[in-house]
Amino acid sequence: MTAPSTSSASSVVPSGADTSPHVAAIHEKILIVDFGSQVTQLIARRVREEGVYSEIVPFQKAEAAFAEMKPKAVILSGGPASVLDDNAPSAPMTILEAGVPVLGICYGEQTLAKQLGGTVEGGHHREFGRAQIEITDDCALFDGIWQKGGKYDVWMSHGDRVTKLPAGFRAVAQAPGSPISVIADDTRKFYAMQFHPEVVHTPDGAKLLSNFVRKVAGLTGDWTMRAFREEAIEKIRAQVGTGKVICGLSGGVDSAVAAVLIHEAIGDQLTCVFVDHGLLRKDEGKSVVDLFRHHYNIPLVHVDVSETFLGALKGVTDPEQKRKTIGKLFIDVFEAEARRVGGADFLAQGTLYPDVIESVSFTGGPSVTIKSHHNVGGLPERMNMKLVEPLRELFKDEVRALGRELGLPDVFVGRHPFPGPGLAIRCPGEITEEKLEILRNADAVYIDQIRKAGLYDVIWQAFAVLLPVRSVGVMGDGRTYDYVVGLRAVTSTDGMTADFYPFEMSFLGATATRIINEVKGVNRVVYDVTSKPPGTIEWE
């Protein structure tokens, strides 16, 4: 359950939205023009890993964003369109004529080449997946990484290809399906590549992006969480003044970091509200209360409404209906508690940068909803409060780094992601207190096993699922007919894609034995070996 997440913070309270300058305003910046690639966020994260602030904007808004941001360099992303289509997306010529370094990736290479007078052809030499390119000439992007004449693995995903160079460019790499795979104009500092350096499947991709950021654009890297902390505190003080702030704590990392940062800025002007809906992991409510009320001395209102939530969920089996029921009820409870606190002028949310950019549509049409996001929705409008969103410029890994900078314990900052609806979506079918207790205990054993094996920080997310089926078993001399527990563990860098974790069979066997022996009501354990895609990380 998370109060602090919203799909589009700027659209929640038009009259009271945060209009103060971004913390990033004083830093070196790179603008990323998004043409609709599924992995554009990875570009931004790779740039941030170099200590440089990056911001993603849709191509339709790129010209205005460039004028406002005054970036030191620009990256053109990939995308699903063809530059040969009528009304194909393009980069504003004002950017290409501004004298700043430009890097084009996949579609970004094609539109850069075409807009500057080159030729792009489509259709006949599609390349998808792993490929090998050969370096035919040196260039600044390759410095210290790739050598002339060498062959290197990359990740391709394209149908069109550049067949004639624009004036001033030279080809510096080739591949079987794209003879002009990397192009360079050293005078204008324009570079472009047909493959995707931002994905892990291009082993040297992060180094190539580093060369563009550091050696081509000449940026020094002044984006650190220590600097962000100091600047964010000043921004919060300027925005809030003497006003009061309430913050919904979920038990997750985002809301916790937001709360500690805001408390450092304004002290007891902040009150946190922790709504325990009865769908949390084992001992989670106690750990949240202990951390904030006793360790940080942050004013905290703890509300136990588990009976109310379980009553509302009785008979509900559809996962979307579960999410919507929990979301609506949370808003009702949080609103009542916030009014009881009284006098709050601001609502704090742990909105992250992906929450802001995920809502952008690049075609003007609707996007497919895979799962509803559980958030506070219209709370600020209903309660006539303004938003404080101190983390809205950060990615998840940056939030964790900020949490450590703020002194939050590693055991808390490094916790695996936990869904807003909690255990409700890890218990397919109808939810009962009995099922939740079985699931809590099984999950606690599983996580304990992972920690003892030293694997917790290696795994992106791990959890148990209580399946809506029973199986026959034999325990002692008797027949059992009990529940089946599914175990899930994945590795990922961002949650957008994920692979199942390849546990040793001995680990799985030992874990299954512990769960069956220690958790009453379970007689069978299975392990989920589905990656994302085709599956999602959570079961519902």
UniProtKB/Swiss-Prot annotation:
Active site: 106, 196, 198
Domain GMPS ATP-PPase: 223-415
TM segment ranges: none
Pfam families linked to this entry: GATase (PF00117), GMP_synt_C (PF00958), NAD_synthase (PF02540)
Catalytic reaction annotation: XMP + L-glutamine + ATP + H2O = GMP + L-glutamate + AMP + diphosphate + 2 H(+)
Broad class of enzyme this protein falls into: ligase
This protein's UniProt keywords: ATP-binding, Glutamine amidotransferase, GMP biosynthesis, Ligase, Nucleotide-binding, Purine biosynthesis
Assigned EC number: 6.3.5.2
InterPro entries from the UniProt entry: Class_I_gatase-like, GATASE, GMP_synth_C, GMP_synth_GATase, GMP_synthase, GMPS_ATP_PPase_dom, NAD/GMP_synthase, Rossmann-like_a/b/a_fold
Keyword Cell inner membrane: no
Highest taxon of source: Bacteria
Cellular component aspect of the GO annotation: cytosol
Boundaries of every Glutamine amidotransferase type-1 domain copy: 29-222
UniProt binding sites for ATP: 250-256
Pathways per UniProt: Purine metabolism; GMP biosynthesis; GMP from XMP (L-Gln route): step 1/1
Single Gene Ontology MF annotation: ATP binding
Subunit text: Homodimer.
Function per UniProt: Catalyzes the synthesis of GMP from XMP.
Name of the protein in question: GMP synthase [glutamine-hydrolyzing]
Provenance organism: Rhodopseudomonas palustris (strain ATCC BAA-98 / CGA009)
Upper classification of the organism: Bacteria, Pseudomonadati, Pseudomonadota, Alphaproteobacteria, Hyphomicrobiales
